[in-house]
Regions:
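Conserved catalytic or regulatory cores that recognize and/or transform ribose-phosphate-containing ligands
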Residues: 1-122
Length: 122
């Protein structure tokens, strides 16, 4: 399965803290998990066409991430929004997806991502 993990490029500390744990997770070995920061000159719009799922780290407001979420919606991808406890997320997201997860620890986030992927397998 191909999974795109979208996140803010600026002030991306919530996902940066979890990044290495997700990369070391068994899920990353079983599926193609892509973070935009791993790629140079990356065309996320084109890449999303070939994805099975989008996980959006929405703790930090980001116009670019909002655009990517819009593309994922246009392509009919399931979208799962995750955010750090205490973050104020955009109300507009509820019109895009009903899948939200608030996490306190990196371990909670990785466990949630593993659960989502295991339950959505193609």
């Amino acid at each position: 399965m191909r999974i795109y993990v979208g996140h803010a490029r600026v002030n991306a500390s919530p996902i940066n803290e979890s990044y290495e744990m997700i990369k070391k997770s068994p899920v990353n070995g079983l599926h193609e998990v892509v973070f935009p920061r791993d790629r140079n000159n990356f065309d996320s719009k084109e890449f999303l066409k070939s994805c099975d799922l989008m996980i959006a780290e929405v703790s930090v407001p980001s116009t670019g991430l909002g655009i990517e979420i819009g593309w994922a919606t246009m392509y009919g991808l399931p979208i799962f929004c995750v955010y750090k406890k205490g973050s104020k997320i955009s109300n507009s997201l509820k019109y895009i997806t009903g899948n939200f997860f608030e996490y306190s620890t990196n371990e909670e986030l990785v466990a949630y991502i593993e659960n989502v992927i295991n339950n959505i397998k193609k």
